[in-house]
Amino acid sequence: MAVVTLAEMMEAGAHFGHQTRRWNPKMSRYIYCARNGVHIIDLVQTAVCMNNAYKWVRSAARSGKRFLFVGTKKQASEVVAQEALRCGGSYVNQRWLGGMLTNWTTMKARIDRLKDLERMEASGAIAMRPKKEGAVLRRELDRLQKYLGGLKNMRRLPDVVVLVDQRRETNAVLEARKLDIPLVSMLDTNCDPDLCEVPIPCNDDAVRSVQLVLSRLADAINEGRHGSNEQRGGDGSEG
């Protein structure tokens, strides 16, 4: 059975690409036609790629691979967190901080600091500090939770990065490729399929398109790990 149907993709608007003047010629094999100055993605190709991506991700999960979901644009942010948590993955959905992968030692120290501050907040230790000092600590806690909260349970570098919007997440792509971490990428018509191992050509701007793709990938991870793609009430922790 197909991972996703043409009707589901049409309803989600997954076929709408960018204006023709903004295209990347390397995406031509995934483009069906142009209408009113906008490229239309070939959803038959997308369905094939989704099937391949599902099998690839399921196999990776079955072998114990760890996943990091990345998507910081407004329309993807909530979905990225939701689906990453549902399958026990980690996520970045606010801003990619330089060195999140390539300077992992420093990043892990910041994550440890976040955990320390959360323990202090839970125990009431921050509330017991002088007012000014407590305010400084709470601001630091809020900032770390915003940018690193999705990485809190990522104990080491991920084995796979699942990406929404390759063009926006350039730094994430560069860091993953530098470390030879494979990328599963949603690719709009302005993207470069050569910069990922597992391409999924589709509209990466529409919320429903992003939701459709990420939910299927989360299903694949759950199926690989647990033998079922049912929702798991995970906390984002990975070994």
From Swiss-Prot:
Keywords: Ribonucleoprotein, Ribosomal protein
Endoplasmic reticulum found in the keyword field: no
Sections of the chain in a coiled coil: none
Gene Ontology biological process terms from the UniProt entry: translation
Presence of the UniProt keyword Ribonucleoprotein in the record: yes
Single Gene Ontology MF annotation: structural constituent of ribosome
Family matches, as Gene3D superfamilies: Glucose-6-phosphate isomerase like protein, domain 1 (3.40.50.10490), Helix hairpin bin (1.10.287.610)
GO terms under cellular component: cytosolic small ribosomal subunit
A Pfam entry, by short name: Ribosomal_S2
Protein family per UniProt: Belongs to the universal ribosomal protein uS2 family.
Name recorded for this polypeptide: Small ribosomal subunit protein uS2
Gene: rpsB
